[in-house]
Amino acid sequence: MYKRQIPILGTSITEYGVALNIQGFDGTVGGNVSGTSDLAPLDQQAAMIYELFPDAETVGLIYCSAEANSQYQVDTVKAELEKLGYTCELYPFADSNDAAAVTQTACDASDVIYVPTDNTVASNTGIVDNICQPAGVPVVAGEEGIAKGCGVATLSISYYDLGVTTGKMAAQILTGEADISSMPIAYAENFTPKYNPVICEALGLTLPENYVAIDME
């Protein structure tokens, strides 16, 4: 068991309230825990889908049901997409073993696929791409790494910048400038719309000029 007096800073934890089972989370964990979140604005991710695919009717949301952060993201994005007029369906899978079957089911029933920031999906982007790309179903991802593996676009944060922010928080704690018990979770301030040039070309998609190509090397 960790020592409660030692400050603990998390880095890139998507949703602290969900991860730590905090009811009514207000942005500050309290105690000896704080850190940074890699949560992109989910309403803007939904808006991105509408911007790119306004004529689509159905969106399938694929995620690992074992990851609480993923459940939070898909529930939120689903609600936002439904406000925009889409018909949405959640497609959870328990682990990598049934990722292919669930992805195939989602692909068969959806015009567009959305995948959140999800560790299991990130480890299985090849499976998602091998099913969705041949079927001509575009995937919009919650973060750049997944978009690089199987997506057409994402609203990306800089994990480097987020790490720098975490480091600055640590420095403030060590020098006594800040008390971790009252230090709110820090979020990324800048988001960049990015696209996967390889998959977009394969699907015949031309994205708006403000989208930046993902480095595929």
Specify the residue positions occupied by each region the protein language model found.
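Short beta-strand elements in bilobed, periplasmic/extracellular small-molecule ligand-binding domains
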Residues: G31-N32, E80-S96
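Hinge/beta->alpha junction and helix N-cap segments in small-molecule ligand-binding domains
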Residues: T36-D43, Y63-Q73, L90-A99, N119, ...
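Hydrophobic alpha-helical segments within soluble ligand-binding/sensing domains
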Residues: Y16-A56, I157-A178
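Flexible loop/turn connectors
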Residues: I146-V198
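An alpha-beta-alpha
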Residues: S34-L81, D179, M183-I199
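Conserved small/polar residues in nucleotide/adenosyl-binding loops
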Residues: M1-Q5
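Periplasmic-binding protein-like
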Residues: L9-T11, V59-I62, Y91, S110-A122, ...
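Short beta-strand elements of ligand-binding domains
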Residues: I6-A19, G35-T36, P138-E144
